[in-house]
């Protein structure tokens, strides 16, 4: 009886180790292509397990969640995934492309980044720049230039498209006062 238990336990630990090795390879391949949050890696690995289970025609193993968590902890320990680093890089990138602070926060929250980490990332998004008084105002200007809104429209269209331009900035997550100041700016 004891021998049968030991053989079963040994087989299960080998299966668990093999699953962990496959998951680690999948996670490394994913991280090789994308900088990612912990939650995104977790979702990707769960989808991978479901796909493997469907392909094999077997249900997903009970130990698969534990294997995913073990792989994620190992990746965190080695520094391959770090939510703070991911949030900082993504916040700067989105800020430089003209996204508002509100839109950046929503984007990061949707990817499972903790609110405290999001706050730190939003604070650090302008560290590279010199003395930003209003980072959202600068982002709104970038957005307006990119979308040809407000002062970037032909002069004959500015007055008739003013409300539409303000609405576009509002939908992008900018406040009414920032939208108004950007749309009414002179080039």
Descriptions of predicted regions:
Residues 2-187:
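An alpha-helical, amphipathic repeat domain used for nucleic-acid recognition
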């Amino acid at each position: 009886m004891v021998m049968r238990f030991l053989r079963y336990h040994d087989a299960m630990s080998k299966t668990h180790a093999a699953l962990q090795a496959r998951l680690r390879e999948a996670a490394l391949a994913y991280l090789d292509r994308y900088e990612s949050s912990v939650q995104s890696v977790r979702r990707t690995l769960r989808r991978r397990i479901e796909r493997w289970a469907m392909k094999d025609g077997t249900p997903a193993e009970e130990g698969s969640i534990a294997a995913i968590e073990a792989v994620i902890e190992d990746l965190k320990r080695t520094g391959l995934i770090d939510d703070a680093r991911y949030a900082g890089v993504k916040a700067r990138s989105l800020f430089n492309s003209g996204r508002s602070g509100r839109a950046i926060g929503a984007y990061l929250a949707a990817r499972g980044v903790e609110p405290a980490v999001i706050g730190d990332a939003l604070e650090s998004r302008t560290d590279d720049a010199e003395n930003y008084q209003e980072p959202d105002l600068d982002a709104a200007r970038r957005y307006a230039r990119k979308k040809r809104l407000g002062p970037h429209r032909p002069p004959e269209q500015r007055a008739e498209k003013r409300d539409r331009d303000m609405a576009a900035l509002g939908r992008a997550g900018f406040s009414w006062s920032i939208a108004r100041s950007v749309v009414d700016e002179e080039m």
